[in-house]
């Protein structure tokens, strides 16, 4: 080892490490706040014709299903499809909302892979 090289962990590396820890703490605090925000959200999904409405949280937790009387007249198979379509719509919107919120949280932090 040549004089002055040390173990490659000079002041510059320590500063980088401190910055990385600070970013991690920012992300952790933001993630906790985002988790609470997502839990409080109510995202609606609908079937075609809005005969069935599903409400989910921002964490994809189902909250309620509302079925209009006209949907009941469609029969079991079609009603099942309407409920499935409304669930998929709510899920898609919920995951898109979560993805957007995560991008907002991590933007500007220059985190690799995010």
From Swiss-Prot:
A GO-annotated cellular component: bacterial nucleoid
Domain of life: Bacteria
Family annotation (Gene3D superfamilies): Nucleoid-associated protein YbaB-like domain
A matching Pfam family: YbaB_DNA_bd
GO molecular function, one term: DNA binding
Coiled-coil region(s): none
Localization terms from the record: Cytoplasm, Nucleoid
Keyword annotations of the record: Cytoplasm, DNA-binding
N-terminal signal peptide: none
Subunit structure: Homodimer.
Purpose: Binds to DNA and alters its conformation. May be involved in regulation of gene expression, nucleoid organization and DNA protection.
Protein family according to the UniProt entry: Belongs to the YbaB/EbfC family.
Protein known as: Nucleoid-associated protein PCC8801_2554
Species whose genome carries this gene: Rippkaea orientalis (strain PCC 8801 / RF-1) (Cyanothece sp. (strain PCC 8801))
């Amino acid at each position: 080892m040549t004089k002055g090289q040390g173990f490659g962990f000079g002041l510059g590396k320590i500063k980088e490490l401190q910055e990385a820890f600070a970013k991690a703490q920012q992300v952790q605090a933001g993630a906790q706040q985002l988790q609470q925000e997502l839990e409080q959200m109510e995202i609606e999904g609908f079937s075609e014709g809005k005969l069935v409405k599903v409400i989910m949280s921002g964490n994809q937790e189902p909250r309620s299903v509302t079925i209009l009387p006209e949907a009941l007249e469609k029969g079991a198979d079609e009603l099942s499809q309407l409920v499935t379509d409304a669930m998929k719509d709510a899920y898609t919107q919920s995951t898109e909302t979560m993805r957007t919120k995560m991008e907002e949280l991590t933007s500007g932090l220059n985190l690799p892979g995010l």
